[in-house]
Amino acid sequence: MSRVGKKIIEIPSDVTVDIKGNVITVKGPKGELTRTFDDSMSYKLEDNTLEVVRPSDSQKDRTVHGTTRALINNMVQGVSKGFEKTLELIGVGYRAQLQGSNLVLNVGYSHPVEFKPEDGITFTVEKNTTVKVEGISKELVGATASNIRAVRPPEPYKGKGIRYQGEYVRRKEGKTGK
């Protein structure tokens, strides 16, 4: 069994954590994140550490405990270091470009596909075939990258499409003729 909830969260010196009831605000050099958590958890903030304490050992409290600790840790990492996901466009004529802050993808459709970044998300394009999604919220970065990938997911026969960097695409053989 995982013991994620019992780990103490180390808070860097340039990050401040503010706890008001079940609302936690984390401020750092890259920005600020606020989130409301379950009422049952309590928090111990001492020096540069934060500990999440559960009221009992019931199954629900144990699961909420681990999830809460992981989410707070992601908030602390996000405002101090940030998160990024890299996507690769593979296919003839597939390319990405920035128009202002918007991402425009040409991926084999009759029209270009445009993405407007949500608050706290930035796009960078390298070599026309690599897109980086950066931000302070791990959840938002992952969801945005997933939405971009969903425009043209990699297909198994030729491997064309948008994929995460390092993603393995299982290839299939085409049908054999007579």
Curated annotation (Swiss-Prot):
<comment type="similarity">
    <text>Belongs to the universal ribosomal protein uL6 family.</text>
</comment>
<comment type="subunit">
    <text>Part of the 50S ribosomal subunit.</text>
</comment>
<dbReference type="InterPro" id="IPR019906">
    <property type="entry name" value="Ribosomal_uL6_bac-type"/>
</dbReference>
<dbReference type="InterPro" id="IPR002358">
    <property type="entry name" value="Ribosomal_uL6_CS"/>
</dbReference>
<dbReference type="GO" id="GO:0003735">
    <property type="term" value="F:structural constituent of ribosome"/>
</dbReference>
<protein>
    <recommendedName>
        <fullName>Large ribosomal subunit protein uL6</fullName>
    </recommendedName>
</protein>
<dbReference type="InterPro" id="IPR020040">
    <property type="entry name" value="Ribosomal_uL6_a/b-dom"/>
</dbReference>
<dbReference type="InterPro" id="IPR036789">
    <property type="entry name" value="Ribosomal_uL6-like_a/b-dom_sf"/>
</dbReference>
<dbReference type="GO" id="GO:0019843">
    <property type="term" value="F:rRNA binding"/>
</dbReference>
<comment type="function">
    <text>This protein binds to the 23S rRNA, and is important in its secondary structure. It is located near the subunit interface in the base of the L7/L12 stalk, and near the tRNA binding site of the peptidyltransferase center.</text>
</comment>
<keyword id="KW-0687">Ribonucleoprotein</keyword>
<keyword id="KW-0699">rRNA-binding</keyword>
<dbReference type="InterPro" id="IPR000702">
    <property type="entry name" value="Ribosomal_uL6-like"/>
</dbReference>
<dbReference type="Pfam" id="PF00347">
    <property type="entry name" value="Ribosomal_L6"/>
</dbReference>
<dbReference type="GO" id="GO:0022625">
    <property type="term" value="C:cytosolic large ribosomal subunit"/>
</dbReference>
<keyword id="KW-0689">Ribosomal protein</keyword>
<keyword id="KW-0694">RNA-binding</keyword>
<dbReference type="GO" id="GO:0002181">
    <property type="term" value="P:cytoplasmic translation"/>
</dbReference>
